[in-house]
Amino acid sequence: MQILVVGAGITGCSLAHLMKHKGHNVLIKEKQDHIGGLCYTTISPSGILYEPYGGHAFHTKDNRVKELVLKFSDFNNYRHNKGIVINSKLRHFPLSRETIRNMEDSEQILKELKERPKIPDLTNFETYSISKFGLTLYKLFIYNYSKKMWGLEPKELTTEYIRNRIELKNTNTHIFEDKFQGLPIKGYTELLRNMIHDIPLELNTIKFDESLFDLILFSGRIDELLKFEFGNLPFRSLLFEYQENENWENENYGTINLPQHPKYIRKVNFKIMHQQKINNTLIQYQEPIPAKNNKPPLYPIYTKENIELFNKYLIEACKSDKIIPIGRLGLYKYLEMGQAISLAMDMIPLIEEWKNLNYIDRYSEIKNLLSN
């Protein structure tokens, strides 16, 4: 088949490579002047590798994903350690009973944890969080962070983003427990460049003639694909600010969450994450903002209304015999990098059968894949 991939982010590049090596003719179009999408890596004037859309620690339990990325880059041995500032004190994150015992409200927090229901309350983001962590911890490290992050009261959100994302441990641990973790030695852009080295690539354009292709894998916004027929699907974005050679509280942490800061939600130390032996530092501060006025859409906002609107768009998109939505923006799904590649791999049978299915079966199969 003649296949066009629109978007050279991690999903687009992965599917382009996989479809090419299944014998299909593939072309990639990318609207930016570079590949990489949201995991694009570049280098600062002082020589520090960094990701302009936020620091990313790669991790996966999927051996298929591990084997694929290791074909195109060596990885450093960074394991994602994160700190969190609560009441002006730096603590380990995710919070553990070990950390809680040293907190001012430890007695009340431990009492609330003991009284938690056995089954979390899935009514909304807030009820789930309180039923998992108790009211005191919720107010300390979840409520303000989440309100800043999403621009909404947590009770307006569904549980999809937070469910199973944060777990309370007995002792301090890494954020991710996957055996395979790290960052590509030369960054994500180089990894993806190697992945698609044998595939034609056109930058600065995503215009295409549908008649020239058998299938088009579209990793842009699904609402944009359908010309915003049902209205705008809301996303959150981030505004990034940088400080060089600023003091960093603890060299064990690549990122530090700032739930009580009036503006920022977190800060990233790229030298630590990329494990560069260099004198300079580059700290990135992240401020959540609406994805408007050409700000990049980064995070789907999980409210009941938004999910219903996405489902409406997805049903309509599935009526096309040629164009298939993929990736975080096309499927309105928060995907970490390992998850994005894993989902891309899982979508291949659907992609190859797309023309033989009716739109209801296409829709059902995508929803099934997204629920895994």
Give the positions of each predicted feature:
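Short loop/edge segments at beta-strand edges and connector loops
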Residues: 7, 79, 199-206, 327
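N-terminal Rossmann-like FAD-binding beta1-loop-alpha1 element of flavoenzymes
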Residues: 2-28
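Active-site/ligand-binding neighborhood in enzyme catalytic cores
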Residues: 87-215, 219, 223-226
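Mid-domain catalytic core of redox enzymes
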Residues: 22, 206-316
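Dinucleotide-binding Rossmann-like beta1-alpha1 core, especially the glycine-rich loop
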Residues: 46-118
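Glycine-rich FAD pyrophosphate-binding loop
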Residues: 20-45
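Short, solvent-exposed loop/turn segments at secondary-structure junctions
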Residues: 10-11, 33-35, 46, 98, ...
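Conserved flavin/dinucleotide-binding core of flavoenzymes
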Residues: 95, 268-372
